[in-house]
Amino acid sequence: MFTGSIVALVTPMDEKGNVSRSCLKKLIDYHVANGTSAIVSVGTTGESATLSHDEHGDVVMMTLELADGRIPVIAGTGANATAEAISLTQRFNDSGVVGCLTVTPYYNRPTQEGLFQHFKAIAEHTDLPQILYNVPSRTGCDMLPETVGRLAEIKNIIAIKEATGNLTRVHQIKELVSDDFILLSGDDASALDFMQLGGHGVISVTANVAARDMADMCKLAAEGQFTEARVINQRLMPLHNKLFVEPNPIPVKWACKALGLVATDTLRLPMTPITDNGRDIVKAALQHAGLL
């Protein structure tokens, strides 16, 4: 459940900005039908930053209810205050989620020792499996391989989502962790190379609109069929890149709407709808991928 193509799911909203239960069900059904390994609910792509704490919990619980055991659900529970991250994580202790994705603290930029103590404290307050999340382009904070190695010794810290796009990190981390520690790419454009170097899968934005392709690509990679996997990846490469032509999740929400997976591409401020130019770029990438 922690390998293959794991989708960083968008949070669908109606025109007033309320979470749409019907569209959420449609998205979950789409991923169940198309081979997605698991769903990350209310991560960065799921607009965790603009949901209240109550809404955050409600969306995860709604996702669990609608998934109904058909696909594993991972809760995004990161925060830049350790006590807040612990509280968010503990909310899901007995909920049915299979694990939590916890991003490095953002904006306050802790030291490596601060990062270690932060994730150690979260792990000590839950039995849920923890997936570390390193995305310095968003957080301003880069968790180094040596810190990951220390954290990997903690029993319920079982994986990392490594979103630097720096492929040397795969080897660096693998040298410092046990063989059962899971390495997940957080960068669609380099995910296949990441897996070829020994990674186990990807937490994917692209999978929101290309679930079957991403699942097939990851399956082929896991089987060592990289030539075949690369055919899929080359077709998706413009999409991997253009889904970030504007800040995530602006482009992917519009793409979901364009494919009829959600009713609107509504976001909450300060996120604003995609520009006309951005829409044209994403549309061309969807067409190149054979999705539109």
From Swiss-Prot:
Lineage, top-rank taxon, reads Bacteria
Which leading EC class covers this enzyme? lyase
Keywords (A to Z) from UniProt: Amino-acid biosynthesis, Cytoplasm, Diaminopimelate biosynthesis, Lyase, Lysine biosynthesis, Schiff base
* One example GO MF annotation: 4-hydroxy-tetrahydrodipicolinate synthase activity
Stored InterPro entries: Aldolase_TIM (IPR013785), DapA (IPR005263), DapA-like (IPR002220), Schiff_base-form_aldolases_AS (IPR020625), Schiff_base-form_aldolases_CS (IPR020624)
Q: Output the PROSITE patterns linked to this UniProt entry.
A: DHDPS_1 (PS00665), DHDPS_2 (PS00666)
Q: Which Pfam families match?
A: DHDPS (PF00701)
- Where, per UniProt, does this protein localize? Cytoplasm
Where pyruvate binds, per the record, is at 45, 203
Give the chief site where it resides.
cytoplasm
Tell me which residues are marked as the site Part of a proton relay during catalysis.
44, 107
Which BP terms does GO give this entry? diaminopimelate biosynthetic process; lysine biosynthetic process via diaminopimelate
The protein's Enzyme Commission number: 4.3.3.7
Keyword flag Cytoplasm: yes
User: Can you tell me which residues form the catalytic site?
Assistant: 133, 161
Any one GO CC term of the record: cytosol
Q: Which Gene3D superfamilies match?
A: Aldolase class I (3.20.20.70)
Q: Which reaction does it catalyse?
A: L-aspartate 4-semialdehyde + pyruvate = (2S,4S)-4-hydroxy-2,3,4,5-tetrahydrodipicolinate + H2O + H(+)
Please give the function described in this protein's UniProt entry.
Answer: Catalyzes the condensation of (S)-aspartate-beta-semialdehyde [(S)-ASA] and pyruvate to 4-hydroxy-tetrahydrodipicolinate (HTPA).
- Tell me, how does this one assemble? Homotetramer; dimer of dimers.
Q: Which family does it belong to?
A: Belongs to the DapA family.
**Name this protein carries in UniProt:** 4-hydroxy-tetrahydrodipicolinate synthase
Q: Which organism is it from?
A: Salmonella arizonae (strain ATCC BAA-731 / CDC346-86 / RSK2980)
- Which gene carries the instructions for this protein? dapA
